[in-house]
């Protein structure tokens, strides 16, 4: 082995012996409340810091002062880099389905395989070419190591293609040079330049193909940036790209080893030290070993990268390649066109999960089941108010709501823009507040509860959640609401009127002493008072046991509500209104109205404060039903 440096293990050992492998200037002592954290028994002394492994500093950096302004060129590597990481690699049917998805999303560069290493990949590439499945505006990418027989086989796979990128690579990192290849820097560089020369020589065998080249110094993050530039410039010198016919220099974070800011420094260094920079597309190939792949990519684009390779929803070796869906939608939330069709993320997820045979996390950015879900009460309340405020602002501006600026607390993106719905935004559990319950009733049943009624009903919902120890779904909330406020008939439907989302529910017991059968309202003789006559069904306090009796009552007051309160006093019920709110539930000739009344039932020490709810096509009748609801609740035997 040619030796051009001390053993990588010697360097690491020295680093680990000093300051736990980190000789960077120490930060000020941490501030804390209470007792300090205790030293762990974790073997941190066996690890060397990245700065000890790859000494590098770049004070000339300019990327921190820049902002994202446009989407990079995207390249999907799902069909090769992603596929090789699967327990069960894709068969031809799954590969073709994935290919069709990528094309439909607007990818213009798609890595289709490693034809010299896999007969399956070779056959798939031949199928795409021979069946003319490659659109004219899509360029396929084929991968090969810097080995002669593999490169020759790669060109065989491309016969008949219109345009292709030949991507050749070799590992150049300190660790790989010493441990895997046992070659010095010059020998490693020669592997790359020999491969580049062979690719150029084989162009005569690829006549008719518009050929481009991509070179990757694999394990770039484990390589001295100065040496990476040296190798890349040597390859550029062989390929001789032009601005009209550029080549790609791809920087793989084959293993994520450091923080995104350091990676960005390295990328900017390479970008500013490459030869013929105007003839080079600088590309990234980030992995996610330390969970920072997306952040590292975005900072590296600021640092000069033009192109990004990754996989849909983050598939790939170990912890995966960077997620192109997350990146694209991050750009979208900044008002930048991602230049990919991400309007149906559920369908993208469905296809990716089918082809990869791997389920994604419930909390995967943008695509997971819970990403637009709020269980927290304060979050729910803020989302509800944010959606309402946005609608009001759009109406005031005379703007289309779908295109109006999106500013809603806790929701960085409009779920509708990516094929999601609002239905699952609010979820209720024992930790939720009244906002979630109120949102679901308003969204799914058109009931906009007053604040104090929300507080009252929330106690009922929370008691149910605490008892069941489960999520409280919309159906549970609606059943609880009916059972508490809307007298239920033998049919299991409410007696309050037609309600959005109401269904038969045999689990509910009929309740409600009084039921309004008919009401007539007229003016008194002098026109100053309202005369009301009502027919009610009195089912007794023990509904189902007592014999129902129809009763009539009449009353006079300065309006229908006052007259009705006067009428029911004939039943021995003294009631007064403390608060009254009503709203329409829909528009049109069959529109319904909802009324909410806060009543004092009884007098003096026996008085109860009770809310009632009524629904009817008549606003007046809905108010009277709400009063009956309050009375029924005050007399209900549980």
Curated annotation (Swiss-Prot):
Protein name: 2-isopropylmalate synthase
Family: Belongs to the alpha-IPM synthase/homocitrate synthase family. LeuA type 2 subfamily.
Catalytic activity: 3-methyl-2-oxobutanoate + acetyl-CoA + H2O = (2S)-2-isopropylmalate + CoA + H(+)
Compartments, as annotated in UniProt: Cytoplasm
SMART domains per the UniProt record, alphabetical: LeuA_dimer (SM00917)
GO terms of molecular function: 2-isopropylmalate synthase activity; acetyl-CoA C-acetyltransferase activity; magnesium ion binding
Residues in Pyruvate carboxyltransferase domain copies: 72-346
Key words of the record: Amino-acid biosynthesis, Branched-chain amino acid biosynthesis, Cytoplasm, Leucine biosynthesis, Magnesium, Metal-binding, Transferase
Region (Regulatory domain): 488-638
Pathway named in the protein's UniProt entry: Amino-acid biosynthesis; L-leucine biosynthesis; L-leucine from 3-methyl-2-oxobutanoate: step 1/4
Matching PANTHER family: 2-ISOPROPYLMALATE SYNTHASE (PTHR46911:SF1), PTHR46911
Top-rank lineage group of the source organism: Bacteria
Functional note: Catalyzes the condensation of the acetyl group of acetyl-CoA with 3-methyl-2-oxobutanoate (2-ketoisovalerate) to form 3-carboxy-3-hydroxy-4-methylpentanoate (2-isopropylmalate).
GO aspect biological process, one term: L-leucine biosynthetic process
Required co-factors: Mg(2+)
Enzyme Commission no: 2.3.3.13
Ligand binding (Mg(2+)): 81, 285, 287, 321
Assembly behavior: Homodimer.
């Amino acid at each position: 082995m040619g030796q051009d440096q001390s053993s990588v293990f010697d360097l690491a050992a020295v680093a680990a012996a000093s300051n736990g492998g980190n000789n960077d200037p120490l930060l000020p002592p941490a501030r804390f409340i209470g007792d300090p954290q205790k030293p762990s028994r974790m073997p941190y002394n066996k690890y060397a810091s990245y700065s000890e492994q790859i000494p590098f500093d770049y004070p000339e950096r300019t990327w921190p002062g820049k902002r994202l302004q446009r989407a990079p060129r995207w390249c999907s590597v799902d069909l090769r880099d992603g596929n090789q990481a699967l327990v069960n690699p894709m068969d031809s049917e799954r590969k073709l389905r994935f290919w069709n998805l990528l094309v439909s999303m607007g990818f213009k560069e798609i890595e289709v395989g490693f034809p010299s290493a896999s007969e399956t990949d070779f056959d798939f590439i031949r199928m795409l070419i021979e069946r003319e499945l490659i659109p004219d505006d899509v360029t396929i990418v084929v991968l090969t190591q810097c080995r002669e027989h593999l490169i020759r086989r790669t060109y065989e796979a491309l016969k008949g293609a219109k345009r292709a990128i030949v991507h050749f690579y070799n590992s150049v990192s300190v660790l790989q040079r010493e441990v895997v290849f046992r070659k010095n820097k010059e020998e490693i560089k020669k592997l790359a330049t020999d491969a580049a020369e062979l690719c150029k020589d084989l162009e005569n065998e690829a006549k008719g193909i518009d050929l481009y080249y991509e070179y990757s110094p694999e394990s770039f993050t484990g390589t001295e940036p100065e040496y990476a530039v040296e190798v890349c410039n040597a390859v550029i010198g062989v390929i001789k790209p032009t601005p009209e016919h550029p080549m790609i220099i791809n920087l793989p974070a084959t293993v994520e080893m450091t923080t995104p800011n350091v990676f960005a420094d390295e990328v900017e260094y390479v970008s500013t030290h490459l030869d013929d920079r105007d003839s080079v597309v600088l590309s990234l190939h980030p992995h996610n070993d330390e969970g920072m792949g997306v952040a590292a990519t975005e900072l590296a684009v600021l640092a000069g990268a033009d192109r990004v390779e990754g996989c849909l929803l983050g598939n790939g070796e170990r912890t995966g390649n960077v997620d192109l869906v997350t990146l694209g939608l991050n750009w979208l939330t900044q008002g930048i066109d991602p230049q990919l069709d991400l309007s149906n993320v559920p369908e993208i997820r469905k296809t990716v999960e089918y082809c990869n045979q791997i389920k994604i996390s419930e909390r995967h950015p943008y695509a997971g089941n819970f990403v637009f879900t709020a269980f927290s009460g304060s979050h729910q309340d803020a989302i509800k108010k944010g959606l309402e405020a946005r609608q009001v602002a759009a109406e005031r501006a005379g703007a289309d709501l779908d295109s109006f600026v999106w500013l809603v607390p806790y929701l960085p993106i409009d779920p509708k823009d990516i094929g999601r719905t609002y239905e699952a935004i609010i979820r209720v559990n024992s930790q939720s507040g009244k906002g979630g319950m109120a949102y679901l009733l308003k969204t799914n049943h058109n009931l906009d509860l007053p604040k104090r009624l929300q507080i009252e009903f929330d106690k009922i919902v929370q008691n149910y959640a605490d008892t069941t120890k489960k999520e409280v779904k919309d159906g549970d909330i609606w059943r609880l609401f009916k059972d508490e406020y809307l007298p239920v008939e033998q049919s299991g439907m409410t007696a309050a009127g037609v309600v959005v989302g109401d269904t038969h529910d045999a689990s509910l017991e009929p309740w409600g002493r009084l039921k309004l059968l008919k009401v007539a309202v007229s003016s008194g003789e002098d026109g100053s008072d309202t005369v009301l006559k009502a027919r009610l069904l009195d089912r007794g306090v023990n509904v189902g046991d007592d014999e129902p009796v129809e009763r009539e009552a009449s009353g006079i007051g300065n309006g229908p509500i006052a007259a009705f309160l006067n009428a029911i006093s004939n039943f021995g019920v003294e009631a007064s209104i403390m608060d009254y709110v009503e709203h329409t539930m829909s528009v049109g000739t069959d529109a319904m109205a909802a009324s909410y009344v806060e009543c004092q039932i009884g007098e003096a020490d026996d008085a109860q404060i009770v809310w009632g709810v009524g629904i009817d096509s008549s606003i007046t009748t809905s108010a009277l039903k709400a009063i009956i609801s309050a009375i029924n609740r005050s007399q209900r035997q549980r």
